[in-house]
């Protein structure tokens, strides 16, 4: 049986100095026989998804210590993509994922912790911690801060979210009073933004990967029920330590739980619920850390057979995460996928022997457990707050309508093919991705004229300045991981296209990425990126581009000979923007760009460069 990792610094005469320091943190003689469990918290007052996490690390710590462990909390950074968006701050968002992963590794390995409880929530924090957990491969439990309640206003018949505020602000026909009302109403509580954006998508995927408890992705941040997830996570971390270190059961290690089948399950869920395209980027990165051979071709294969069973904002205005929870949360979607023969149910989870066992216990259409039904009735209170667990509102009934409800059965799917697709062609030889859940069927096949912008800033200026017309395909390039650097999100350009009435009349292609709040014919992650010699860097104004989602293709309608001539010319000039950009690129960002790979590899570091 493996020794506690922490014995490195807690046992032996020569560790007297280290033990003296441990004692200074409050440890006693008896504590040196217990597992040391790191709590990676991500509390910050900058981010609504994390503003309520301040005391939750110690909540978990107390539960760990009651269960027989020693808890030690530390913090990571957390960037708010919504606040960082639309200016140079967005250059730091994706690179922060690597910083978070590294910081968790640094703290856990420097202090020889035996296990981790990861308290995450928003866009890059859950992926960063997931990468670290799979890199370290010690017992781990994820528990996130939970989703925000949807906003309410008398000016709209549907729930509001961040994207609604952005769209009305850019719509010249909306009064200042309406914009102000949406601004004040869109984000009413603490928690990750209320739709199926990147943060909520990733927190849902941790359930499918088997690394978090049921309800982690859908239980509202404000609801009292969420406290139980934190308490159970603390107890579970100690239990996993006992099974691994005490009994030699390595099935509890994250790489043995999040194996190839589990990654397929996570991607299957993502496709079925129309999650953010960013999840593709993060799952590819996590798979590399887990040494799982899961790549873009696997995602392409799954996208062709998995139907869309759930539609949530921004793909539809009617439903938000609180509605997903009322419909039974993630395990109800997993249950429908399992009944459709689309899920691996023999994989283990941190809380159940198998996914099949977990579905039987937690799918509201299978279980008769009244406690489970009560749990999924947890609903919004509609009271603005920044306090976790501050309300106990219940829906009067569950949404178990699998024909016309929020979550559908395979037989009543929103669409036969899922909400995400991978496209290939001469403009993206290594692939690009589109959230089909947010694309109107009338433009699933679209041919248009390229309108070139060498940066997001230039595109925003062009769209707001009416340079983009119906039938155009907006090309935003040199915004990839290396070229940005940092692979900015393009939520502003897509929102402004909507506000200009062009949401169903234009397309957008970029080597950058999109916010989970994006909808419309928005194609990102074009690989190779322009800065790496990708063909997106060869497109010229007026070129025709054909997008064909049903056939999973995207092609620049230019001859191979012409492309070869353009490539030879570009090689001479160097792969950089044709127009200068007023962009501050710090040493930290330059270091990131030096090692960054294109999006088809998850935008992770190029290990070949590091290994020499």
Swiss-Prot record:
Protein name: Dihydroxy-acid dehydratase
Transmembrane residue ranges: none
Biological process annotations from GO: isoleucine biosynthetic process; L-valine biosynthetic process
Pathway given in the UniProt record: Amino-acid biosynthesis; L-isoleucine biosynthesis; L-isoleucine from 2-oxobutanoate: step 3/4; Amino-acid biosynthesis; L-valine biosynthesis; L-valine from pyruvate: step 3/4
Catalytic function, reaction form: (2R)-2,3-dihydroxy-3-methylbutanoate = 3-methyl-2-oxobutanoate + H2O; (2R,3R)-2,3-dihydroxy-3-methylpentanoate = (S)-3-methyl-2-oxopentanoate + H2O
Domain of life: Bacteria
Organism: Pseudomonas aeruginosa (strain ATCC 15692 / DSM 22644 / CIP 104116 / JCM 14847 / LMG 12228 / 1C / PRS 101 / PAO1)
Active site positions: 515
Pfam family, one: ILVD_EDD_N
